[in-house]
């Protein structure tokens, strides 16, 4: 119960079933069953709009080397919950039904193969989608590890429907991503090189992008850790942007997107000053090669490079 009503702007039809009013309630039940080789669990909820959301998963250990997972969800377009979180393609527990099927296979020693396919349907319109729509997400990942060496290959195909340029029909937005990496981890140091590729297609338009990156870690002393990385990216536009992981502060997650042409380089360090105090710092610079300024408006930077600095002190009592 709120003292003031929620009043979303429902002049846009896709917002017609957003939460509104002052009084909300949700009731739900979770359930499950465990077996030595398979398990079933799920949760079903009902809201004050008398709409249902349910998520159910079935896992099966087919052999000692192969495990399977199936996950079904149904989130009514009339269902809403202010703080709910659950597996979905669209990012919210509303207006979606779908089936996810995945497998984890270890055919031989040191080799693992993971794959999934996920099909989803949304009966109600969404932002930039003026009707019911479908999506299809697929991933194949292969990892080979032997001793300190690791080789990884990954391919992802994602298809979503969106309004075309004329907004008179839906068109398929097709994004393909491929990644290859090789890593080495020793007692005091580690290194990794990675290559990423992206191809984007929508309504007759295409764009592509690629990125190469390398990072290294070193622990010269018991109390000191150092990491550095460098990235070169080259994409046609934002649609073919590329992503890479960056180590950051404790409890933070950094997975920035890069587009255009440029170089990113950064240094990370952590020092355990004593048993109570630790200091973590990171400094990085992104230098664009295809522009003379960055961003616009109040955030505009009148040069082609920008530097970011983070520091964190942690005291353990």
State each model region's role.
Residues 2-11, 16-317:
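Exposed, low-structure sequence patches enriched in small/polar residues
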């Amino acid at each position: 119960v709120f003292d003031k009503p929620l009043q979303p702007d429902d002049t846009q039809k896709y917002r017609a079933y957003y939460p509104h009013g002052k009084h909300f309630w949700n009731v739900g039940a979770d359930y499950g069953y465990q077996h030595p080789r398979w398990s079933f669990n799920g949760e079903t909820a009902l809201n004050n709009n008398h709409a249902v959301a349910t998520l159910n998963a079935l896992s099966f250990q087919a052999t000692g080397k192969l495990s399977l997972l199936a996950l079904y969800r149904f989130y009514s377009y009339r269902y809403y919950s202010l703080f709910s979180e659950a597996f979905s393609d669209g990012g919210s527990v509303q207006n979606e039904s779908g089936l996810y099927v995945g497998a984890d296979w270890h055919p031989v020693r040191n080799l693992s193969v993971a794959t999934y396919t996920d099909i989803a349907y949304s009966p109600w319109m969404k932002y930039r989608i003026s009707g019911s729509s479908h999506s299809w997400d697929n991933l194949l990942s292969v990892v080979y590890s032997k001793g300190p060496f690791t080789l990884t290959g990954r391919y992802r195909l994602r298809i979503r429907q969106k309004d075309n340029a004329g907004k008179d029909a839906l068109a398929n937005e097709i994004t393909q991503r491929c990644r290859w990496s090789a890593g080495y981890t020793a007692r005091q140091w580690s290194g990794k090189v990675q290559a990423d590729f992206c191809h984007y297609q929508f309504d007759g338009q295409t764009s592509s992008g690629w990125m190469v990156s390398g990072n290294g870690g070193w622990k010269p002393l018991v109390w000191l850790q150092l990491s550095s990385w460098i990235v070169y990216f080259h994409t046609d536009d934002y649609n073919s942007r590329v992503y890479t992981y960056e180590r950051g502060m404790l409890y933070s997650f950094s997975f920035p997107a890069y587009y255009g042409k440029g170089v990113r380089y950064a240094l990370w360090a952590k020092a355990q000053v004593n048993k109570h105090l630790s200091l973590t710092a990171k400094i990085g610079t992104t230098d664009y090669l295809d522009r003379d300024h960055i961003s616009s408006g109040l955030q505009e930077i009148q040069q082609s490079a920008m530097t970011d600095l983070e520091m964190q002190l942690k005291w353990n009592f």
